[in-house]
Amino acid sequence: MVTYINHIDAIIKHADERCKEHGSRLTVKRKQVLTVLVMSNKALSAYELVDVYKQEFGHNMPAMSVYRILEFLENENLAHKLSLVNKYVACTHISYLHTRCIPQFLICRDCSKVEEINIKSTIISELNANINESGFKLLSRQLEIDCVCEACI
């Protein structure tokens, strides 16, 4: 358990350093919301975050505040919004730079578990070419794939 807590602390420390490098601040509440996302094994909606925040920290946080914090975390590449389920996950690459990675997500439709994976850029390029050939334009390179995880099969 101590190793797990140390791992989370290290992730939050990296996130704090990245924010400072960008001239922004990872405030206490932002750290707490990010911690909840990092600790969660599934994607969470803003309202689920409100509930978990109250359980973990004993304070109420309005949903609008959570949405503002989530927007900040997205802008800092510390969290991702999953449009397919309208929920959020912590970026799994917080501890290192991933400027060349395009986030791709496997989302379990039964338990909401999310796995962030890397897909070769050649596959994304080929997909984009196929989309263009079909007369469409790819608006987001982030893929969210509806799946069922091993535990739910």
PLM features: residue spans?
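Short, Lys/Arg-enriched N-terminal segment that forms or immediately precedes the first helix
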Residues: 9-23
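Short helix-capping/hinge SLiMs at alpha-helix to coil transitions
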Residues: 22-24, 38-41, 56-57
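Short helix-coil-helix linker/hinge
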Residues: 26-29
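Pre-recognition alpha-helix immediately N-terminal to the DNA-recognition helix
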Residues: 31-36
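DNA-recognition alpha helix
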Residues: 45-58
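Basic amphipathic alpha-helical segments that dock to polyanions
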Residues: 66-76
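Non-DNA-binding regulatory cores of transcription-related proteins
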Residues: 75-153
